[in-house]
Amino acid sequence: MAPTDAEIKATIKAVVDDFRGWDLAPIMHYPNEEGLEFQDIYFPSDDGVPLEGWFIPCKSSNKIIIANHPHWFNRAGIPSHLEPWNQLMPGNDFEVNFIPDYKILHDAGYNVLAYDLRNHGLSGSGNQGLFGFFEWRDVLGSLKYIRGREDTKDMMIGLFSRCAGANATLSAMRHRPEAFKGVRCMIAPQPISAGSSIAVMLDKMGAPASYMEEADRQLFMKTSFHISQLSPPTDAKHANVPTFLYQVRDDPCTTPKDVQSVYDNIPIEDKKLKWIEGTDKRWDGYTYFQREPDQFLEWFAKYMN
């Protein structure tokens, strides 16, 4: 049975409302659970929003990885084995814990800065709680913090930019390309376009594609932005560091074409795209680093040694 107009519009509204508010996930895990020393740190975003994070030192190392996170998550991951986060994405009702990622990086010889994006974790709120359009300023703030801190200012920098964090990093490269001078490389799991995810949602519920106009109208009225303004493939044209993308191929939230377009639009030769096969769980893309880290450590080592 086809959905009614009212049902389609209500579903669109629920998606659009998430751009202005969601259930904040608590920080469930800390680096000391993996035997890692760490400092609680804070620094301003480029526009002044206070950001909270961890600095995880690796003694005698002159290399640092700056890590951010997907939407709904924070620097520690997400407790999606618990209510209400187990309802975010059907089939992804298992916890994602990012602390093992930081342990792998530390043991491979990297300092780590992991921070919460604005409106997530313990970081401050900005832009009336708006998601998706200003996190690029947080990326710039993290770079300024590392370059301004006495014990990290001369370190080689690599980026671990996950999902919304990848979107934000690509957007920052468009807005402030000069800020990435000297950044050695990036790994970027699962960037995602608003247009792709909304189109897939409409298709799965059997709604005509013409409802994209209604989705765009609702998004604009809620956020002052259009769907086309949240487009990693467009921002990828400004990517200026070696970039390793990876993505669950059968992710039901998007299409392979979206991430393929991000890859295709990166204008430099030093790029790579890895498809994760055998699963349709988006969250498996976020735990893939800790399951199969060697290829990513090789990428970092190639550009940071």
Show the residue positions of the predicted features.
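Short beta-strand/loop motif that positions the catalytic acidic residue
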Residues: 238-240, 245-247, 251
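N-terminal targeting or regulatory segments adjacent to alpha/beta-hydrolase or S9 domains
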Residues: 1-34
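N-terminal cap/lid segment of alpha/beta-hydrolase-fold proteins
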Residues: 22-64
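Short alpha-helix in the alpha/beta-hydrolase fold that links the catalytic acid
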Residues: 241, 255-264
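C-terminal catalytic histidine-bearing segment of alpha/beta-hydrolase fold enzymes
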Residues: 260, 264-305
